[in-house]
């Protein structure tokens, strides 16, 4: 039997209900009827069962009915005058830049569609950072940057000269195209292009604020995270990929505001559908509070008169492609093709002129509707909020761009179009001045000037604004605290285990232990980190309500509201977004944290390189640990896991400092150096990428002459053979063991001595060499600078061997002083097998190193060809094997 019968057992009662609802519609309108029905739904429990099935998509009307709208707290007239000037200056900025014929680009239409939304926020919601409040964190939609510059200009925070240099940054006085903290370090906080990164970063930023609060590190409970997004941007996987996380974490400090102008760059977002409906169903289904702002106040009376319900029916069934077309036409067109669909809706507007119909506004352009939505959003407890604002792309630009597919590409406007915009928004500019594309500002004694500054003063100050360096200083550990790792280790261990020991040392340091943020993407046991579960706990905002299966074990899975580990599950992008929030906490919160995100090195830069690039832009400071690195060192996982190129990807980010250490003391020195550089007096805007391996071997102790070379990228590890040294062999990471074995074979079998070098960073050596080259080119009369690697090495033939592509060690070729230089690497797709077999397959084992050395010595006449032939035979090298790069 069905839970609810479809049979009408009392038609008379049913008719009474229908007539009652019709009466409400007739007397008070459809919105009131909807309100009553929805209220009834909330209060009709039946044996704990759901009586009314919830629909994921509500009617295409505002979520907040007119009777629930709060009074608007500002002066609408003054705000409109201010908003019009901001709109104008944003357009002038782009037009003046375009006039220079520098092909600079720039976007006009996005901000025009969102201007009212931003201004309501600036006047009534955005709290700035001040002595009493950490301030709201705002992710501004990238394409609307001219509007934010325009507001900062009338606030006297930016100058006309800066506006005139929009997208002209080389001379140091320009404004960046989009929000870029790297380029405007005292202004923008968050880079929001490429699109999709803003939403996911906002989610994990909100989570990190909760993390700080729950760990009693910083009070963040008054802060909100706003993410301004485009409806087209919501198609990015990153935009919606973590929204269930936000609901699961009950991030009621997070508000998404989606500018639903129904257009993306080329055309409609969903021309044959309704993007607002789609987003409502997706977010509502994930547990978000959804607030729709569809129609402006001019629709209120029409909706109230809609006794038949046909207007709402019409709104529900009209497609986005048609809504866009309507706003690109005129009132007569809308009367015929929208209202004219039904007699009832045609009747609703019979007394309205075409101009009145045209001026029926969308909710995202009505300050009162916007304020009501934002006010409601700020009151929601226990869940994140998304506000869907219905707007028009190119709003106010008329025939130039309003509602047109070309709106995103418009960068130039003729004098007729400029005049139209001036008149549309009543901008105080004389007709004869229009050809000069003048900016407009307010006199310091004007009502508008006083008003906008008073609003910002009430909200704590101005934004966006960014803190370049933290003032919340703390004591860093000395190198002596890592002494147990600087001496020879008693047993064979891997550098991954060394990293865990470093982490434990830092967690014992009373000055910084609370600032350490271990971050993992569900691989803690892989990396041997499970011992930290009980020690510092896994962060969970509600603690641990269940009894963990392994509770009796010492290292049981302990979740805690004050837990320190951020366990992000199988979610590399989310883990990296958490890392970015922690790595920029020094700026966003003036509370520096020290994040260590450890991951399979193959699933770092290759998988989420876009976010790591954004981290460079955002001036992140922290550590990325590429675990189980090296194509042959992670031996059993195969093609998708074998990392032979993460260091090459890392070197593309200028402020990412990368190392591939081989020994415990190297890793300890590198981490200590990183702490000093990022969190010490110099506060360098860099972050570290360090690869660690899972291969166990003997870890020797450090010598006094090694410290500088470890940090700069190379040092001489040892001489093999006191006499007859003929070759230099460079090794990196685990492959240094193969290098050392090859050096012994060369000595024992061929009486060839070697200088063995440990290269901790080919990338840093290459950058140093390039810097020296540049200096020498530009300063021809001054003493030449010598690259560090050139000073350390000599003219003997050199071989470089790594577990990475040949390109990794090729980057230093120009600075190697050797008479010949050969590199061995692991180009090609990975395989699963033993380390021994893999290294033989990729031709980087000790025997191939020996052959390579003999080959280089043959070039200078130190050995003959027969020696090489015999060695190939002796070591059973298959000369007919397919090149591993091609296999």
UniProtKB/Swiss-Prot annotation:
What's in the keyword line of the UniProt record? Answer: Oxidoreductase, Pyruvate, Thiamine pyrophosphate
User: Could you list the residue ranges that cross the membrane?
Assistant: none
Q: Reply yes or no: does the keyword Lyase apply.
A: no
Q: Which cofactor does it need?
A: thiamine diphosphate
Asked if Oxidoreductase is a keyword of the record, the answer is yes
Q: What is its EC number?
A: 1.2.4.1
The record's catalysed reaction(s) read: N(6)-[(R)-lipoyl]-L-lysyl-[protein] + pyruvate + H(+) = N(6)-[(R)-S(8)-acetyldihydrolipoyl]-L-lysyl-[protein] + CO2
Gene Ontology molecular-function annotations: pyruvate dehydrogenase (acetyl-transferring) activity
Function comment: Component of the pyruvate dehydrogenase (PDH) complex, that catalyzes the overall conversion of pyruvate to acetyl-CoA and CO(2).
Q: Which NCBIfam families match?
A: aceE
- Self-association state and partner proteins as the record states: Homodimer. Part of the PDH complex, consisting of multiple copies of pyruvate dehydrogenase (E1), dihydrolipoamide acetyltransferase (E2) and lipoamide dehydrogenase (E3).
Q: What is this protein called?
A: Pyruvate dehydrogenase E1 component
């Amino acid at each position: 039997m069905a839970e609810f019968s479809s049979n009408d057992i009392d038609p008379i009662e049913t008719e009474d209900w229908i007539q009652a609802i019709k009466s409400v519609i007739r007397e008070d309108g459809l919105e009131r009827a909807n309100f009553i029905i929805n209220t009834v739904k909330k209060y009709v429990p039946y044996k704990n069962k759901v009586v009314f099935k919830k629909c994921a998509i509500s009617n295409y009307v505002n979520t907040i009915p007119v009777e629930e709208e709060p009074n608007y707290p500002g002066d609408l007239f003054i705000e409109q005058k201010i908003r019009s000037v901001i709109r104008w200056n944003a357009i002038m900025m782009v037009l003046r830049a375009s006039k220079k014929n520098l092909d600079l680009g720039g976007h006009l239409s996005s901000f025009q569609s969102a201007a009212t939304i931003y201004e309501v926020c600036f006047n009534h919601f955005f709290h700035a950072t001040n002595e009493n409040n950490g301030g709201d964190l705002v992710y501004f939609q990238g394409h609307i940057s001219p509007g934010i510059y325009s507001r900062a200009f009338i606030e006297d925070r930016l100058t006309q000269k800066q506006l005139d240099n929009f997208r002209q940054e080389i001379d140091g006085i320009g404004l960046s195209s989009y929000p870029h903290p790297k380029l405007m370090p005292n202004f923008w906080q968050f880079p929001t292009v490429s699109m999709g990164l803003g939403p996911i970063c906002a989610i994990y930023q909100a989570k990190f604020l909760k993390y700080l609060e729950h760990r009693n590190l910083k009070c963040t409970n008054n802060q909100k995270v706003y993410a301004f997004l485009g409806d087209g941007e919501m198609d990015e996987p990153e935009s919606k990929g973590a929204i269930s996380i936000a609901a699961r974490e009950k991030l009621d400090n997070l508000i998404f505001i989606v500018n639903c102008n129904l257009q993306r760059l080329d055309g409609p977002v969903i021309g044959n559908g309704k993007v607002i409906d789609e987003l409502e169903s997706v977010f509502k289904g994930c547990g978000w509070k959804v607030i729709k702002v569809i129609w402006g106040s001019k629709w209120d009376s029409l909706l109230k008169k809609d006794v038949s319900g046909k207007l709402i029916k019409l709104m529900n069934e009209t497609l986005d492609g048609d809504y866009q077309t309507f706003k690109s036409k005129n009132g007569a067109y809308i009367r015929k093709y929208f209202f004219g669909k039904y007699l009832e809706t045609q009747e609703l507007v019979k007394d309205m002129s075409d101009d009145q119909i045209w001026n029926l506004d969308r909710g995202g352009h009505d300050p009162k509707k916007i304020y009501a939505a934002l006010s409601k959003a700020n009151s929601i407890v226990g869940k994140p909020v998304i506000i869907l604002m219905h707007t028009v792309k190119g709003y106010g630009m008329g025939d130039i761009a309003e509602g047109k597919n070309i709106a995103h590409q418009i960068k130039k406007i003729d004098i007729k179009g400029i005049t139209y915009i001036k008149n549309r928004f009543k901008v105080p500019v004389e007709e004869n001045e229009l050809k000069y594309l003048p900016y407009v500002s307010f006199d310091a004694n004007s009502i508008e000037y006083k008003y906008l500054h008073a609003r910002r003063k009430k909200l704590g100050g101005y934004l966006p604004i960014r803190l370049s360096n933290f003032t919340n200083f703390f004591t860093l550990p000395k190198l002596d605290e890592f002494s147990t790792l600087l001496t020879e280790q008693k047993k064979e261990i891997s550098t991954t285990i060394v990293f865990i020991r470093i982490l434990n040392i830092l967690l014992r340091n009373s000055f910084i232990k609370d600032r350490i943020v271990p971050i993992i993407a569900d691989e803690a046991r892989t990396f041997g980190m499970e011992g930290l579960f009980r020690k510092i706990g896994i962060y969970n905002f509600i603690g641990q309500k269940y009894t963990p299966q392994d509770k009796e074990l010492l290292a049981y899975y302990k979740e805690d509201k004050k837990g320190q580990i951020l366990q992000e599950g199988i979610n590399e992008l989310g883990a990296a977004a958490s890392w970015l929030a922690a790595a920029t906490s020094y700026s966003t919160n003036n509370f520096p944290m020290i994040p260590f995100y450890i991951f399979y090195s193959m699933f770092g830069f290759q998988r989420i390189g876009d976010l790591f690039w954004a981290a460079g832009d955002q001036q992140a400071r922290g550590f990325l640990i590429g675990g189980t690195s090296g194509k042959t060192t992670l031996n059993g996982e195969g093609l998708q896991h074998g990392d032979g190129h993460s260091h090459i990807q890392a070197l593309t980010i200028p402020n990412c400092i990368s190392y591939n250490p081989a020994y415990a003391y190297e890793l300890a020195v590198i981490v200590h150096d990183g702490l000093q550089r990022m969190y010490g007096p110099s506060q360098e805007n860099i972050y570290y990428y360090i690869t660690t391996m899972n291969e166990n071997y003997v870890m020797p102790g450090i010598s006094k002459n090694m410290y500088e070379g470890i940090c700069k990228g190379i040092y001489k590890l040892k001489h093999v053979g006191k006499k007859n040294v003929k070759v230099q062999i460079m090794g990196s990471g685990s492959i240094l063991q193969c290098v050392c074995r090859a050096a012994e074979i060369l000595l024992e079998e061929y009486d060839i001595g070697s200088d063995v070098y440990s290269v901790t960073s080919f990338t840093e050596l290459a950058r140093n060499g390039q810097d020296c080259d540049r200096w020498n080119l530009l300063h021809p009369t001054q003493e030449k600078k010598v690259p560090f690697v050139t000073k350390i090495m000599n003219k003997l033939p050199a071989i470089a061997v790594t577990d990475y592509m040949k390109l990794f060690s090729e980057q230093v070729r120009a600075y190697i002083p050797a008479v010949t230089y050969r590199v061995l690497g692991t180009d090609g797709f990975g395989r699963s097998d033993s380390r021994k077999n893999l290294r033989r397959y990729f031709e980087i084992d000790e025997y191939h190193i020996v052959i390579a050395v003999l080959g280089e010595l043959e070039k200078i006449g130190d050995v003959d060809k027969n020696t090489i032939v015999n060695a190939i035979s002796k070591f059973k090298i298959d000369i007919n094997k397919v090149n591993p790069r091609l296999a």
